[in-house]
A protein has these predicted regions:
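Short beta->alpha connector loops at strand-helix junctions that form conserved
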Residues: 72-73, 113, 139-140, 162, ...
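Active-site/ligand-binding-proximal alpha/beta "capping" segment
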Residues: 183-233, 237
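Boundary-proximal intrinsically disordered activation/regulatory segments immediately upstream
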Residues: 1-57, 142-143
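Structured adenosyl-cofactor binding patch, chiefly the S-adenosyl-L-methionine
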Residues: 91, 130-131, 145-158, 215-251
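Glycine/small-residue-rich loop that forms an oxyanion/phosphate-binding "nest" at active or ligand-binding sites
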Residues: 67-94
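RNA substrate-binding interface of SAM-dependent RNA methyltransferases
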Residues: 44, 97, 102-189
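Short acidic-hydrophobic, aromatic-tinged amphipathic segments that line or gate anion-handling sites
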Residues: 3-6, 70-73, 161-169
C-alpha cells in the first residue's frame, strides 16, 4: 500500500477539489465518498472504484485490481475529509454514464424538481432503491447526486440506482416517447388523492419544500395528486412526501 504524508500531495489536492466542486467532479469524471460502511457497499455492488484512502490503523479490505490504495496519517485525513470527524476511509468512484436512454421500459419513475438539499436527495434515492423505483430524474437545479453528502445519505443506493440529470423539456419528450404520464404532487383543479391515482405505470414529480413544483413542470403534468393528511398540516418534507409516493407505487 502506498503511504502519503503530505497534505500538499497532488492526490490530496485532487480529493479536496472533488469534495468542494460539482464542476470539478464532472470534469474529472469521478466523485468522492467517505466511510468504511459505504466502502463496503461500493465493493459489494462492484462500484467502479478508482482510489481508496485509509487512515493509519484502518484495515484495508480486499480491493479489485487496478484500484489505487493509499494510507495517510490522521492529520492528512482530517485535511481531506468532508466530515468534521473523519470516518477512516475515503474513496473515489468513476461517474456513471448518465445519458438519457432512448426509451423508458420500466413502470415507476420519480422526478425531483428543484430539490436542493443534499440530504433530502440522498434519502430519496435510498428510498427509491428500497421500493424498486425504475429511475429518478433530477431537473431544475437539484442537489448534486454525487456530492459526498448526497452519496452518504443514499447508504449505497448511489451505486445501483439509475439517476438522470436533464432539462424539463428533455424529460417530457422522453416520457411522451415512452408513453408514460407525468403526475405532480401539487394542488390544482384536477387534483386526486394519491390513493385513487392510477400509478401502475407513471412518473411522479416532487417539488422543493419552499416552492413546490415549478410552473414549468406543473404545466406539463397530466394530473396532480395529493397525499391525504391531517388538516392541521400544510405539507410534508420533500423526502417524506417522496417516500409516501414511492410506497404507493410499489405496493
Amino acid at each position: 500500500m502506498e503511504h502519503i504524508t503530505s497534505r500538499q500531495n497532488a492526490l490530496m489536492t485532487h480529493i479536496r477539489k472533488l469534495n468542494a466542486s460539482r464542476a470539478y467532479r464532472r470534469a474529472s469524471g469521478e466523485y468522492l465518498c467517505d466511510g468504511v460502511k459505504l466502502l463496503e457497499e461500493a465493493l459489494r455492488w462492484n462500484a467502479p472504484l478508482k482510489t481508496v484512502v485509509l487512515s493509519e490503523g484502518v484495515d484495508a479490505p480486499a480491493l479489485p485490481s487496478g484500484v489505487r490504495a493509499v494510507q495517510v496519517p490522521a492529520d492528512v485525513m482530517r485535511s481531506i475529509s468532508p466530515m468534521e470527524t473523519p470516518q477512516g476511509a475515503l474513496f473515489t468512484v468513476r461517474l456513471p454514464d448518465t445519458a438519457l436512454p432512448e426509451m423508458l421500459t420500466g413502470a415507476h419513475y420519480l422526478v425531483l424538481d428543484g430539490v436542493q438539499d443534499p440530504g433530502n436527495v440522498g434519502t430519496i434515492l435510498r428510498t427509491a432503491d428500497a421500493f424498486d423505483c425504475d429511475g429518478v430524474f433530477l431537473v431544475n437545479a437539484c442537489a448534486d447526486p454525487y456530492s459526498p453528502k448526497t452519496a452518504r445519505a443514499t447508504m449505497g443506493a448511489v451505486f445501483r440506482r439509475d439517476v438522470y440529470q436533464c432539462t424539463a423539456d428533455e424529460l417530457c419528450a422522453l416520457l411522451q416517447k415512452s408513453n408514460l404520464p407525468l403526475y405532480g404532487a401539487a394542488l390544482r383543479n384536477d387534483t386526486v388523492s394519491l390513493r385513487d391515482a392510477e400509478l401502475s405505470r407513471a412518473a411522479v414529480a416532487i417539488g422543493s419544500e419552499g416552492r413546490g413544483l415549478s410552473a414549468e413542470i406543473l404545466s406539463k403534468c397530466e394530473k396532480t395528486i395529493k397525499i391525504p393528511m391531517s388538516p392541521r398540516c400544510e405539507s410534508l418534507n420533500a423526502a417524506v412526501a417522496a417516500s409516501v409516493v414511492l410506497w404507493e407505487m410499489y405496493r
